[in-house]
């Protein structure tokens, strides 16, 4: 007996519809109208749609059970949760705000944490708030303070005791790590799990699902304390723009909070002398698939170079990093680890980001190791070329295509630390642009070596576009 042939491609909508319509004459001879307007055909097509959807989910069930193949965000979140990895939400951009006086005051002026400032742009307004207190001494006229992008929001709830459900927050773009919870004016601590929580541990968890809905979860009274019935719960968080919060220097110019000294309002000027960097949208599934196994291999402890790299690149706000030790440079001492850190969106990392990352790594490193964080060096690569276009091509359009191709080639997301720029790749890139006949490259003339701690970036572009003879 021959082996039965099973068709695995007849479970979609069209295949189900054809098969069901073909079976109708076998069941009855009274149904002869198969127009799309027929009520029976409408019902049949509805069942075909449901069957198509069920078949898809059944086929995808096996793929959704494994992290490398899962495509639905909620399934990736659940799989990562099994290995104690949590996908990052939006990350607030950080910068330094400089507060300036017209003349020194007779006393020290304290600018409290939470002072808000604004950058007015054509698209929208971007608000920053200081992350720490800053003081202008009476002999000086300015001070710099670290700041994060976002608007502070507060919500109040009432605890319902043992029957209470998780608290659902209204904010959808909550900055990663910005949630703070008070129960009866007593602050509780956020944890990633309740495994090490006791019955009196004032701990809570913040969980965000695939729809960006954030829930505050308390313990059950055994693993983590449970708020008393009727207790007031106050939740405070920062709502951020993510990657849109990255902006250039000297754009934050408005002070929204009032600053007083001895009851009098003090006029202050504000600006950001350095760019705002490190802002990022919620973590992508591709990044989670790559980062979660790397952090599991490190066991969240920094011992090897791979451990430091995994922990640094998994830190919110860090796009890429490079780890250097004594094996890479003779000037580096034993038991010293140097990290070049590039923030999300490119540019230099802010002082606030480096402080947070240093504290994070300090708690996970070997006690004898010294960690040094430094800014990346963006190595400009200038392009000087003579480009010959086919007859009939618009020369300005060809030029814009080449400029766009170069911008895409040197995009920050594509470049990695220490990766050389090959001459042949640049020639092939320009020669492959639509409308280009051939290219004569003057600069560069050979491969460009990029040293450790450096990232290639597009420099000056000089293109002589002419028609091919």
Segment roles from a protein language model:
Residues 1-469:
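Signature of Asx- and small-polar-rich beta-strand/turn repeats characteristic
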